């Protein structure tokens, strides 16, 4: 019966046997593809006419085709101008015939078809895009670079990946050797190609043949090799299309590529897409734009500021803070060695720079927040106290003061029965709207809470899902939903509820217009269907999906579909709970008269059992310390404070872990500061609070935004930042003197 209700497969009975008829998508693609042909002028127009003898199978064909091609549609014959289409087909075929017979020269025919080089950042993304246009020709250009050649109709396209950034600021040039020159009142950043250690992955810009990390010394690859390949390819094509990510960082990578390829290319255009789908790629190719120099300038300022402040503070941390930490931390060990008359072999190392110490404008306040949460856990004034009341199979948790907590705890320890009285005030009904779809910070928060994943891992998974064409761009602070997104939600709800889908569907844009969108699925494929399509080989992805990929996709899918559904109507029970002379109001969600979006997203609200009035036992009392910060707490705090960006949320936390300033607790996976982290933070706040504080960091983010919006000149901001660097750090003699005096206390008698 359920199969009959689906409306996209047919159940028939012939010769006393039952059959299930399912549309054959692969055969349809193959057959309809024969109506078009590739020729020197492009791809001929084709027409596929389907004679329908069972509407259910047509519905099934349309649904299954949309799984593979999100913009696929079938139109009724009366909706199109058949004569016009046939005329265009016949004219085009006559043209092909003339080309083949030699009446039209091939060179003239190909004028309509251009060759293009499409550069994206990721090899997986390049491979995914190529798969949209048939089976590509593959060219292995060197050990790392592969080009995929396909035909899109308008273009013969070579698709290749730059593999991320190609250039970064040089070192040992400019003011303080930080890679920025000052000439005629202007700041000129000096860039060079990035080098990367094959062994440990360390990236740098020094002109070195081996990895500079002492313990490694591995072989090095350099982006100059990538650039040379791209320059050669640029000479072969009519136009270079740069399709790097649609954010400030992507704009800067694209601009670097433009500058490097300009002497070799006839024409260079920027294309922008927010999802890796066939429709989005074709739209972007057909609507190229110029580079947004405001975004490029904002990213230049971000990188220069990061270099200036990061290098200046890190140099101090690597020498002065490391020496203090190392010697004070090893003090006990050194005393033991002295008692045994052993040489202090550890001490000289304490007085050499430790390159794993660093500091930065954003990471410092984030470290401070983690430390504050740790200190709160050890502050009795921040503790909370609860009594747990046993109500049938559930628990009512009621907050009480410390005196009540101690009194009841003593009674329970002595074996006394302690009760509470629960009075039912009444029931009330409320309407609850669904939450908006995910932004970067809310996705990181949800995945951390529900899946226990680190922010770095979530961003890796989201990057994979984006590059595979399964979700929209994942570095976003927008909740906006496009018409294409609303269409995805409609199709999913229609699949789930059939003709009744309109009862559940309530489309919302969740924000004003703009380029950026919320994180959402790109196609109407639910998580279970995705797993099935991949398993059966119907949906072929360029890399395998893990269990965690499916889990994160489920979060994104359910949150998005819920955001396009009607509100829920829930029932709340109001209670008055009396304990030990105290009285408190308690509300519990006990049901729903209309589940609405909770049908898809039940985790949003916890539904508990309805309570009857009466006396109930207190089964326990608990003392709750403020919890340590977890990944989602840090991300939420950064968002609230206005520091950091979607592209840096995960990186900041990972940097603190890499520097061993914080560590993960084994069970809770919470963030706990280490001794070295506390020392570095304390010294930074003591000496540079006006540089690394929350407020000054937030103001800098606002300045970056003003540059992006064209409200501030980026050179003016660079001048302000340089003055800050000079006055407050590099030439702050009071601070330098204090640092040197401390250093001499620890290392003055040691020859290094």
Each model region followed by its residue ranges:
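Conserved segment of the helicase C-terminal RecA-like domain
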Residues: 3-9, 21-30, 34-65
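Leucine-rich, amphipathic alpha-helical/linker segments
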Residues: 499-522, 690-736
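Short hinge/gating elements
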Residues: 12-18, 46-50, 112-116, 198-199, ...
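Long, highly charged, low-complexity internal segments
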Residues: 154-159, 166-192, 199, 347-467, ...
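Non-catalytic, charged low-complexity extensions flanking SF2 helicase motor domains
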Residues: 49, 53-54, 70-105
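C-terminal or mid-to-C-terminal helical accessory/interaction module adjacent to the motor/catalytic core
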Residues: 78-86, 100-105, 111, 208, ...
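Intrinsically disordered, low-complexity regulatory segments
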Residues: 108-315, 321, 365, 606, ...
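Accessory beta->alpha helical hairpin/"wing" motif in late/C-terminal subdomains of nucleic-acid enzymes
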Residues: 472-498, 651-688
